[in-house]
A protein has these predicted regions:
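Membrane-interface amphipathic segments in extracytoplasmic regions
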Residues: 1-319
Length: 319
């Protein structure tokens, strides 16, 4: 394992993954096609382990989200490599060093829809408290709820930045500190296609980019007015400036956008499923912890009783 103290950029490299077989370094950014790109790289690298999905106890809403588990994607973190390998990854012309970006406002909308509106697991409680549902005639008003979020993140930014889904993209990829060789914009199909082609060339595969984590399908223009857009543009000003995304023009006022009957039912079902999943996941993790602890106690007693002859294999001591 790399000693982080000897790797000067380690504090900035916590998100970066590597696909050693195809020599690709990738910095995933949440809500920027990261599920799709991780799956692509894991398959190309030959490290994707679908069999492990069934044994996970974490709260995953969809099977596609399990690709973020290291045990599933098999992609090591840059900071966990030996120092010599880190230096090669960061400097060798043989390595592709890539990151993806997305329009900051579109990304913020996607993050709100997933983390706040849908109550995705792991969302900070304080962020959800700051963004209660806004109602119109007794129905959830998506436009007013999104406006509430835009005000909240502008006024209480720190409460949201605990969740990396809301972090500015510049804070994650650190483009001024790492020598990336490719940047792709997810809005540009030809750029994404170029990345997929390069990965396939390196892996000698014919993989395609799969789409995951689709939202409710409500266009941003239906729920975002110019006031919300301005607040979010200010919050993510560094992304607009660094990545060259222009500010967009929105209507001064948007009409209420209450959820339809089917949409409201879907939202209730989704939130209910999240609550149940979190409860089941907590119970599963607790049970796994109890079983692990019991095994360790038994092994300790067995080793003591046999004067160290039992469970002598170091690889089995903590299994």
């Amino acid at each position: 394992m790399a000693r982080r103290g000897r790797f000067a950029l380690a504090p900035l490299a916590g998100f970066i993954l590597v696909a050693p077989r195809i020599k690709v370094m990738y910095c995933p950014t949440t809500k920027v096609a990261c599920s799709s790109l991780k799956l692509l790289l894991a398959k190309a690298n030959g490290s994707y382990d679908a069999a492990r999905v069934e044994r996970l106890v974490g709260p995953h809403i969809a099977r596609s989200q399990t690709i973020h588990e290291r045990r599933v994607n098999g992609l090591p973190k840059l900071v966990d490599l030996p120092l010599r390998e880190i230096q090669e990854v960061l400097a060798s012309p043989e390595w592709l060093r890539v990151y993806a970006t997305r329009d900051p406002l579109a990304r913020a909308y996607s993050a709100w829809e997933n983390r706040i509106f849908s109550r995705a697991p792991g969302t900070p409680d304080r962020a959800i408290e700051l963004c209660p549902d806004e109602l119109a005639d007794g129905r959830v008003d998506v436009a007013a709820s999104f406006a509430r979020f835009a005000r909240a993140i502008a006024e209480h930014t720190d409460a949201f930045m605990e969740d990396h889904h809301f972090l500015p993209q510049t804070h994650i990829v650190q483009p001024d500190r790492f020598d990336y060789t490719m940047r792709v914009r997810v809005e540009e199909p030809e750029e994404m296609a170029r990345l997929v082609a390069e990965v396939n060339r390196r892996a000698d595969t014919r993989l395609e980019l799969e789409r995951h984590n689709q939202g409710f399908g409500i266009p941003l223009a239906e729920v975002c007015d110019k006031h919300s857009a301005n607040r979010l543009a200010a919050t993510y000003a560094m992304d607009h400036e660094r990545f060259g995304y222009p500010t967009r023009t929105f209507a001064a006022i948007v009409a209420p956008r209450p959820l339809g009957q089917v949409e409201a039912s879907l939202l209730r079902s989704f939130r209910g499923a999240v609550e149940q999943l979190q409860a089941v996941s907590f119970s599963a993790r607790s049970l796994a912890g109890v079983r692990f602890g019991a095994r360790q106690i038994w092994k300790s007693l067995a080793r003591h009783a046999t004067l160290g002859r039992a469970y002598r294999d170091p690889a089995q001591v903590h299994w």
